[in-house]
Amino acid sequence: MKVLLIKDVKSLGKAGEIKEVKDGYGQNFLINKGLAKLATPDVVENWKAEQARQEKELKEEIERFEAEKKMLEAHTIRIEKQSAPVGIKGSVGNADISAAIKEQLDIDLDKKHINLKKALKSTGIHEVDAKLGHGIHATLKVEVVGV
């Protein structure tokens, strides 16, 4: 019997491959555990269409991240804090930067994706790294201004 592997099977092959297996192994183990499907022409065609759709979505997502990276690197994020005799009162953290990006550039960037070694406690322009996804990083310029 021919089966289309849905998931990687250590001793058999990788997902997407069509393999010839014994009927009992294919029916009782692979298909029953959801590791494979019977390789009919319809199933193979649907699998290829699904893979093409997922690849297209991934490409679009990467393009979106690249566009966001260009926008983030082209702009300086301005954050206003109450000034103190030295620096500012309080500090600027990941959540503040994330909220400022949403407000100023309308880009949703989770605070967990902003790599800030320690909170910003002084005025001026600071460079901050942000992970957008799929290995794409942006270097943000954050300007902290005392008001």
UniProtKB/Swiss-Prot annotation:
Keyword Ribonucleoprotein attributed: yes
Keywords: Ribonucleoprotein, Ribosomal protein, RNA-binding, rRNA-binding
Protein's GO biological process: translation
GO MF: rRNA binding; structural constituent of ribosome
UniProt keyword Ribosomal protein present: yes
GO cellular component, one term: ribosome
Gene3D superfamilies hit by this protein: Ribosomal protein L9, C-terminal domain, Ribosomal protein L9, N-terminal domain
Any Pfam family the entry gives: Ribosomal_L9_C
Function: Binds to the 23S rRNA.
Family membership noted in the UniProt record: Belongs to the bacterial ribosomal protein bL9 family.
UniProt name for this protein: Large ribosomal subunit protein bL9
Organism: Sulfurovum sp. (strain NBC37-1)
